[in-house]
Amino acid sequence: MSTLFIGDIHLSVEYPEITKNFFRFLQTEATQAESLYILGDLFDKWIGDDDPHPFYREVAAELFALKKKGIPCYFIHGNRDFLIGQAFADESGMILLPECKVIQLYDYNICILHGDTLCTKDTEYQIFRKIAHHRFIQRLFLCLPLSFRFYIAKKLRLQSGEQNKKKGEEIMDVDPQSVLDLMACHDVDWIIHGHTHRPAIHNIEMIVTPLLSSKKIARRAVLSAWHNEGSMIKVTFDAIELIFFPFRVSDFEKI
């Protein structure tokens, strides 16, 4: 028995090999799991559920096929696909979750999220995020013609790329204190997230009883982005593992 977590797949028409390998994952590894959690940035961009491009219908069909096999797929929005709505969720069979969710899984108490909210030192991004997640702004954006939405999204991605080149590594990574605060707030022993593209499992020393100097070791598991290989976090009764798997091309000639 296992539960799988993935994120930062960044599906796009421009990167067909990533799509092919994602479909392979859904048809193989994912079918052996009890459930699948996608922790944001499933797509490289998302300008609305009403985008009629066949690419999105194909992805939705593959995800829905997993549901038909009796395997639930849960989704937390990322910074690139936070506009995914209930319409696409219904089409794909995904179950939308809030941006931060605590789950009891086997013997673990885990907080799952995309991870961008932990990068609190990146104040420019956090300001943008607050604006972009405002319901009025989102409704206004979704009222625009698709072509104009596509133009805005492309321009924002270019601007973000240029800004990120000027930011230090520390600013773009999670803030350690924000991690501690989140774990203490939800009383969890594990955090699983993506966003930073810095895969690892970190040990975190937490003070349980300040007066007695009582401490415990918590852990933070970070997913990798899907570029030249895929990654997942596999949770079983025995362990929580970060697993990488190489992309394969020859298997997908018929996909």
Curated annotation (Swiss-Prot):
Main localization, broad class: membrane
Listed Gene3D superfamilies: 3.60.21.10
Classification via InterPro entries: Calcineurin-like_PHP_ApaH, LpxH-like, Metallo-depent_PP-like, UDP-diacylglucosamine_Hdrlase
Pathway, per record: Glycolipid biosynthesis; lipid IV(A) biosynthesis; lipid IV(A) from (3R)-3-hydroxytetradecanoyl-[acyl-carrier-protein] and UDP-N-acetyl-alpha-D-glucosamine: step 4/6
Positions annotated to bind Mn(2+) 2: D41, N79, H114, H195
Record's protein name: UDP-2,3-diacylglucosamine hydrolase
Organism in which the protein naturally occurs: Hamiltonella defensa subsp. Acyrthosiphon pisum (strain 5AT)
Binding site for Mn(2+) 1: D8, H10, D41, H197
The gene coding this protein: lpxH
Family: Belongs to the LpxH family.
EC id: 3.6.1.54
GO CC annotation, single: cytoplasm
Entry keywords, A to Z: Cell inner membrane, Cell membrane, Hydrolase, Lipid A biosynthesis, Lipid biosynthesis, Lipid metabolism, Manganese, Membrane, Metal-binding
